[in-house]
UniProtKB/Swiss-Prot annotation:
Catalysed reactions, semicolon-separated: a plastoquinone + NADH + (n+1) H(+)(in) = a plastoquinol + NAD(+) + n H(+)(out); a plastoquinone + NADPH + (n+1) H(+)(in) = a plastoquinol + NADP(+) + n H(+)(out)
Family: Belongs to the complex I 49 kDa subunit family.
GO biological process, one term: photosynthesis, light reaction
The protein's name in its UniProt record: NAD(P)H-quinone oxidoreductase subunit H
Gene3D superfamilies: Cytochrome-c3 Hydrogenase, chain B
MF terms (GO), sorted A to Z: NAD binding; oxidoreductase activity, acting on NAD(P)H, quinone or similar compound as acceptor; quinone binding
PROSITE patterns linked: COMPLEX1_49K (PS00535)
EC code(s) of this entry: 7.1.1.-
Organism this protein belongs to: Synechococcus sp. (strain CC9605)
Length: 394
């Protein structure tokens, strides 16, 4: 008896760019053999706004409000890196109190970033309840930001070359301590709901496994790298701001799958709480901004000393000039390494301003880790990467 052979042709399916699980306007062109993923091609650029060119036509103070629109979950990190680059190029020291305030804002943003990752990721794999819980905690972080900067989510416009825009208001540190005391048990609540939940573990354990060598070769960073057995955290490696003053550990796992990335982010929130508590207790007094960086140092032969500028009301704003030279600086955001390559030519605007977004690099490994998985696993693996398309496309 002859047996008929069944042949299936590969099928090409479009995911996005308007699919609710796409985490933004990301389009995936997926080739399927039945239920199995054969190939995947990410299509990006739908949210490109020319941020680097905007930076090259703005002074630093003018550009700081723009940057939090790139990654609305990590606005403080982008504000920090945008002012760190000219600071290091011009060797401008930052007062100790300002550095502590920066750390407080960055660690609050790290917790907010991980919370905004946690809710949609769990919704992607079928757990709806934690999605509503995370906004309860984020609301308290919004209140802290609003008290210090005037804005809640983005456009905080708080970081400045040489420090921060304003000191913390009276009672802010006590409110931050209250948040730390309140949020610690909430992480335990998440772990009780999620971490050892057998349905959750069977759903994502073993998915999207990335080996240690692959993570390094693909230039991954942040939880994507640390979940694959590489304890690399720029807060420990580069010793920027005042992180060396605090006692905390790098969160990392060895398995390299979606579950390991979840464990890393949960532990990072605990470590951020430790840093916040220590910063609230140890913050010194003193100025919050190096005002010398704002001084207009033009010299006698400059137009600023001429008749027109002095007597015809054409007052020159105290704009910092970026000195000649080039420099790359980086910091550890909630998603990984974000960096800026800046090239100055003794002008108020940079000649070149290149932004390295962490999730842009992390997204590139997606086709590599999707091959061989089922079509239903695409959303779980993509969700574990933590992408915001504003910073991917820039």
């Amino acid at each position: 008896m002859t047996q008929l052979e069944t042949r299936t042709e590969p099928m090409v399916v479009n995911f996005g760019p308007h699919h609710p699980s796409m985490h933004g306007v990301l389009r995936l062109v997926v080739t399927l053999d039945g239920e199995d993923v054969v190939d995947c091609e990410p299509v990006i650029g739908y949210l490109h706004r020319g941020m680097e060119k905007i930076a090259e036509n703005r002074t630093n103070v003018m550009f700081v409000p723009y940057v939090s629109r790139m990654d609305y979950a990590a606005g403080m990190f982008y504000e920090a890196i945008v002012v760190n680059a000219p600071e290091k190029l011009a060797n401008i020291p930052v007062p100790k109190r300002a550095s502590y305030i920066r750390v407080l804002m960055l660690e609050l943003n790290r917790i907010a970033n991980h919370l905004l990752w946690l809710g949609p990721f769990l919704a992607d794999v079928g757990a709806q309840t934690p999605f509503f819980y995370i906004f309860r905690e984020r609301e308290m972080i919004y209140d802290l930001w609003e008290a210090a900067t005037g804005q809640r989510l983005i456009n905080n416009n708080y970081f400045r070359i040489g420090g921060v825009a304003a000191d913390l208001p009276w009672g802010w540190l006590e409110k931050c301590r209250d948040f730390c005391d309140w949020f610690g048990p909430k992480i335990d609540e998440y772990e009780k709901l999620i971490t050892n939940n057998p349905i959750f573990r069977r759903r994502i354990e073993g998915l999207g496994r990335i080996e240690k060598e692959d993570a390094i070769n693909w230039s991954l960073s942040g939880p994507m790298l640390r979940a694959s057995g590489v304890p690399w955290d720029l807060r420990k490696v580069d010793h920027y701001e005042c992180y060396d003053d605090f006692d905390w550990q790098v969160a990392w796992e060895k398995e390299g799958d979606c579950y390991a990335r979840y464990r890393v982010r949960i532990e990072e929130m605990r470590q951020s709480l430790k840093i916040l508590r220590q910063a609230c207790d140890m913050i010194p007094g003193g100025p919050t901004e190096n005002l010398e960086a704002k001084r207009l140092n033009e010299g006698k032969g400059s137009d600023a000393a001429g008749f027109d500028f002095q007597y015809v009301a054409k007052k020159v704003a105290p704009t910092f000039k970026i000195p000649n030279g080039e420099l790359y600086t980086r910091l550890e955001s909630g998603k990984g390494e974000i960096g800026v390559f800046i090239q100055g030519n003794n002008d108020v605007t940079p000649w070149r301003f290149k932004i390295r977004a962490a999730d842009s690099n992390n997204l590139q490994i997606l086709p590599h880790i999707l091959k061989g998985h089922k079509v239903a696993d695409i959303m779980a693996i993509l969700g574990s990467i933590d992408v915001i398309m504003g910073s991917v496309d820039r």
